[in-house]
């Protein structure tokens, strides 16, 4: 073990103090400064939020504190990182040996990573993984460590914790896996918890649970917390102080109240302007672009909302009683014994120039609905009509022709672009496959499409890895628009992007809708973004639509309890409206898996207003 280093002093309540930290990465002789001259501190019981967009250096800062940045090729070449252990001794993390760091990590210093599935070992039960940390740092035997593991799972409000002990990570939902990560991080009562984007990929209701859980446990353990995020709504919900990072440097640091009430730096002002605030569209019947601030000049760029749905138009897409189920085989004869009831009797219409948003939590069936429209998954029942033609049983050339008119934008642009092809060829490929034009004309159209989505024509020669996340999503939008589609299905198209990039992509989609009359089926779990972009909204739960209507009615007068639950879980980017603590919701969405012949109960939608329909029946877990 290490001993206190003479001369290192911290104020009594101070847990960590970072002074002039600089980190760089070197690759092929080129040096990239990831963090430059960063200074901050965190006291016991305090939460510091470090915010900024991708590439700002916030995650590198956390890895430097854990001394894990060296394993990723980083070099800490300047600065001090003073840290107070639980026993009161102070040491400089920068100068600590790896042997000492191994005793600190998981004990005095703990970290929750963004993606729990990649942080948990898939071949060990989650209980064994938590118990291993407890045995290592607290010198407990197996029986005592298992009992302490059970106590920690109870502490993080996992229902039926005893049954969860022996489950593997893949058998748990995203919210449950993140709670397991929190239990593991807190199992040895650390002085400092670093939470690196712990809720970014989670649904709003699960996110609300995780944020409240961290606050409750912080109070119980009097722990310092560094919360790393790009979501300003989350910052307003959890932080006492905020550090804003941009290109590896601190551009502003102040109390959470000061940052939100009177941000000084143009970059901070731009971040806040790009935050989709729930309720900001109150009284407005049509979608509206984000009033973006130029982050260099702080000048606002706004527009006037206008209707893009032609009067007296017929629906371009009609879906009636769509049912999609996936078989589960088991037993010696590999027979179908159960089914995943992904979509149950879903019906809706979509008009030209309209955006209909499908919202709900993971597993509600919204993505399956979008894929079923293009026959990317097989539906068992239902009727789909596109532009007056029934399409749900099209095959061969007829189906290929349909896919010219209905295009799909996926959530992960990197996974949906071939890394071996230039982005120019990826955009051109649909034009060549469908024999729309010759190669020379296709190259001209690619240049025009890239310009239209805010990229340069010369970018056509680059590969996907040479672009940022937001730029890659623009490439995917350009590819989707190459064939002049009438309908675009956007499946979580902006959920993984930084707030300002997200706002730019939403604005681009609204511009293209206004220019070309495209109808969007926008699939999302982000209620604040949905409020901004939608004409109408359909709320899905357990494969069923439980509420559908004009966006203004659904958001300002939600009728179904599940819709209200989704709304109340959205973090508000205003610390003065910080949600008072509610009873922690631990209900998981019931399983959609049923035995053969066990039909789910569905209820017809009842009209409660003009084009506003609600399912009037109690659904377990929705209330």
Swiss-Prot record:
Primary localization: membrane
Cellular component annotations (GO), alphabetically ordered: plasma membrane
Keyword Cell membrane (UniProt): yes
Record-level GO BP terms: peptide transport; transmembrane transport
Keywords: ATP-binding, Cell inner membrane, Cell membrane, Hydrolase, Membrane, Nucleotide-binding, Repeat, Translocase, Transport
Amino-acid positions noted as binding ATP in the UniProt annotation, renumbered to this chain: 52-59, 360-367
One GO MF term attached to the UniProt entry: ATP hydrolysis activity
Role noted for this protein: Part of the ABC transporter complex GsiABCD involved in glutathione import. Responsible for energy coupling to the transport system.
Family recorded in the similarity comment: Belongs to the ABC transporter superfamily. Glutathione importer (TC 3.A.1.5.11) family.
Protein name: Glutathione import ATP-binding protein GsiA
UniProt source species: Pectobacterium atrosepticum (strain SCRI 1043 / ATCC BAA-672)
């Amino acid at each position: 073990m290490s001993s206190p280093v003479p001369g290192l002093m911290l104020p009594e309540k101070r847990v960590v103090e970072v002074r002039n930290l600089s980190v760089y990465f070197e690759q092929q002789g080129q040096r990239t400064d990831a963090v430059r001259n960063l200074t901050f501190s965190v006291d016991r019981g305090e939460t510091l939020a470090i915010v900024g967009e991708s590439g700002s250096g916030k995650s590198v800062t956390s890895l430097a504190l854990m001394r894990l940045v060296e394993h990723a090729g980083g070099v800490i070449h300047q600065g001090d990182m003073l840290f107070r252990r639980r026993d009161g001794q102070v040491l400089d993390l920068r100068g600590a040996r790896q042997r000492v760091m191994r005793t600190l990590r998981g004990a005095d210093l703990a970290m929750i990573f963004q993606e729990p599935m990649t942080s948990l070992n898939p071949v060990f039960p989650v209980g064994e993984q938590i118990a291993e940390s407890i045995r290592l740092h607290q010198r407990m035997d197996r029986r005592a460590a298992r009992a302490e593991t059970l106590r920690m799972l109870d502490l993080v409000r996992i229902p039926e914790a005893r049954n969860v002990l022996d489950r593997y990570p893949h058998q748990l939902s995203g919210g449950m896996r993140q709670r397991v990560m929190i239990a593991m991080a807190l199992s040895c009562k650390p002085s400092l918890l670093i939470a690196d984007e712990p809720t970014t990929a989670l649904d709003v209701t699960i996110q609300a649970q995780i944020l409240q859980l961290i606050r409750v446990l912080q109070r119980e353990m009097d722990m310092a917390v560094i919360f790393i995020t790009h979501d300003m709504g989350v910052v307003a919900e959890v932080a006492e102080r905020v550090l804003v990072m941009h290109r590896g440097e601190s551009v502003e640091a102040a109390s959470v109240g000061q940052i939100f009430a009177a941000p000084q730096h143009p970059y901070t002002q731009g971040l806040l302007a790009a935050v989709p605030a729930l309720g900001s569209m109150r009284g407005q019947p049509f979608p509206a672009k984000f009033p973006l601030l130029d982050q260099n000049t702080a000048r606002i760029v706004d527009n006037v909302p206008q209707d893009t749905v032609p009067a007296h138009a017929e629906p371009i897409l009609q879906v009636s009683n769509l049912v999609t189920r996936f078989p589960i085989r088991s037993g010696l004869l590999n027979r179908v014994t159960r089914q995943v009831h992904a979509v149950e009797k879903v019906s809706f219409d979509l008009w030209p120039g309209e955006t209909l948003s499908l919202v709900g939590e993971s597993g509600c069936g919204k993505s399956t609905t979008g894929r079923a429209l293009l026959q990317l998954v097989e539906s068992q029942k239902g009727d789909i009509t596109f532009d007056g033609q029934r399409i749900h049983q099209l095959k061969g050339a007829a189906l290929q022709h349909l896919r010219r008119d209905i295009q799909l934008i996926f959530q992960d642009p990197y996974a949906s672009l071939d890394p071996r092809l230039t982005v120019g060829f990826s955009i051109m490929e649909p034009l060549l496959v469908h024999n729309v034009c010759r190669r020379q004309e296709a190259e001209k159209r690619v240049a025009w499409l890239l310009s239209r989505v805010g990229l340069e024509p010369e970018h056509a020669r680059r590969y996907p890895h040479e672009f940022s996340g937001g730029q890659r999503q623009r490439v995917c939008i350009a590819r989707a628009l190459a064939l002049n589609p009438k309908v675009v299905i956007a499946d979580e198209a902006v959920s993984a992007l930084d707030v300002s990039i997200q706002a730019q992509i939403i604005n681009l989609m609204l511009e293209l809708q206004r220019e070309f009359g495209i109808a969007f089926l926008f699939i999302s779990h982000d209620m604040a973004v949905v409020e901004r972009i939608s004409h109408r909204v359909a709320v899905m739960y357990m494969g069923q639509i439980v509420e559908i209507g004009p966006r203004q009615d659904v958001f300002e007068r939600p009728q179904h309890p599940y819709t209200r639950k989704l709304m109340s879980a959205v973090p508000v980017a205003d610390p003065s409206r910080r949600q008072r603590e509610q009873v922690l919701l631990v209900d998981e969405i019931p399983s959609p898996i049923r035995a053969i012949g066990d039909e789910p109960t569905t209820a017809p939608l009842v009209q409660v207003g003009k084009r506003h329909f609600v399912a009037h029946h109690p659904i377990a877990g929705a209330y």
